[in-house]
Amino acid sequence: MRQSVVGIVRKDNKFLLGLRTPGGDVGEHWEFPGGKCEAGETHQQALIREYEEELAVCISVGQFIAHKHFQNEHRDFDLFAYEVIILKDQACVSSVHSELKWFSLDEL
């Protein structure tokens, strides 16, 4: 079964989300950055790699937050969420996200 990870970044009671570029199943939707785990990769290694690829930042992976199993006609996977701390203060958009934005808990 496929495993995916997301990192939840919290700063000043706001959460960092990325707007997916158009196309695919999740195009033009806001999401916590992350992605699929590669073979032999731990959740922490996958998050570090995904944040480097998607946002060009170095991170520290904190505590485990939640796990959710998803199953539908297109997907069957487990999603694991972790607290993430960005070690540098600057994140940038990539080909995966067209925009990054901070949201309050009420906006989520």
Language-model segment annotations:
Residues 54-61:
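Short secondary-structure junctions
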Residues 25-29, 91-108:
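Nudix hydrolase/Nudix homology domain
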Residues 1-16, 36:
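Conserved N-terminal beta-strand and adjoining loop/helix that marks the start
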Residues 3, 58, 68-91, 101, ...:
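Active-site-adjacent beta-strand/loop module that shapes the phosphate/pyrophosphate-binding cleft
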Residues 14-53:
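Conserved Nudix-box catalytic region and its N-terminal flanking loop in Nudix hydrolases
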